[in-house]
Amino acid sequence: MSSFDTSRLSPALASVFESVQRRDPAQAEFHQAVYEVLLTIAPLAERHPEYADLAIIDRIVEPERQLQFRVPWADDLGNIHVNRGFRVQFNSALGPYKGGLRFHPSVNLSIIKFLGFEQIFKNALTGLPMGGGKGGADFDPKGKSDAEVMRFCQSFMTELSRHIGPDTDVPAGDIGVGGREIGYMFGQYKRLKNRFDAGVLTGKGLTWGGSFARTEATGYGLVYFAAEMLAAKGTSFDGKRVVVSGSGNVAIYATEKAQQLGATVVAVSDSSGYVVDEAGIDVALLKDVKEVRRGRVSDYAAERPGAVFVADGSIWDVPCDVALPCATQNELPLSGVQALIKNGVQLVAEGANMPTTPEAIEALQAAGVAYAPGKASNAGGVATSGLEMQQNSGRTQWAFEETDAKLHQIMVDIHANTVATAEEYGVAGDYVAGANLAGFRKVADTMVAMGLI
């Protein structure tokens, strides 16, 4: 049925995985996410026979609820289009479902389920009371007018509003969903419900319930986590060459924070290619090109003396000490990792969700390269969403410095928890196993306590 080697799983876990494949045979991304978690939780399952007695693992891999709906909207010429919307409410053991909305042509149920499944454990690692979920639509905001995006968002929220709420399900942004889209959706929710429920969405504007540091959070948090990894190796970002794939929100603010800590970020990318800037990426120019003009990295290269744009090839061929994949799933293949290792990479930490292929992860670990999975290293975004929910509940707003300090502490704590759990289960230094074991244990123990629901 697939290339997954179930002989590496215990018989009980292999049975769970084969059931997932049998029920949803076409969901490759979801299978990959489940397999990666099951590979690492065997020692936990062995210590806790009650998990098997209560079918905890079987229940965790099955969403509590998955919604699919049509989203009709009219373009500026009056033509009607129909897109497909999704919301997977995966697990609410620890709190309201929490996870972003992705608007991209590639969106399908498999991708939303993989993201929602990862979100369960990522949210558990933050220490904040949040369950896991994810949603989105196969709509492409690129090339659309503001009015078209608004009409789509209003149609999308008209259906989604039936299923969300501050104590039920709290969506946020993701690829293709930024402050503009969150604003349009929040406005429609407020109009439909006749209530100002600030806590129903996160990633809001600062004047209407948003949090300082939310925009920066995923990128900053990634670098805070990577800095802890470097410190564990007796070093720091100071003087390091860094490559960051992507040039969206996560990549921009990871670049900014890494350079604040003394690193030189020498390359960023987008779907058109990558740019090499040996002097260090000019973050102000990158923000102007990507956030203001919504341009390409080739525009950055055209305006930045000494920068070189490369349309073909791989950004992973650029020599670096630290690699931060911040674009999309499965962007870092085995060939990319082999190039990184050949050029002496010391650390890889994920800013995107599942950007490194399973074969590439194994190659990194075999080579002794420190590697952090996204569920740990990119948890800063959802952590700060959780902080935004706290502020909304208290009808208050913290200063940037206070929120950033809380974010920093959360990332330090996630690192410590991941490392300690890996050591506890005999896999010291394995960040993948440590993160999976720590997150899974918290969710599973809570489900045991709550009974069969």
Predicted regions and their residues:
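Adenosine-phosphate binding glycine-rich loop
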Residues: 2-33, 229, 341-453
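General beta-strand structural signal in soluble alpha/beta enzymes
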Residues: 168-172, 196-200, 244, 267-270, ...
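Structured beta-strand/loop patches that form or line metal/cofactor-binding pockets in enzymes
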Residues: 50-81
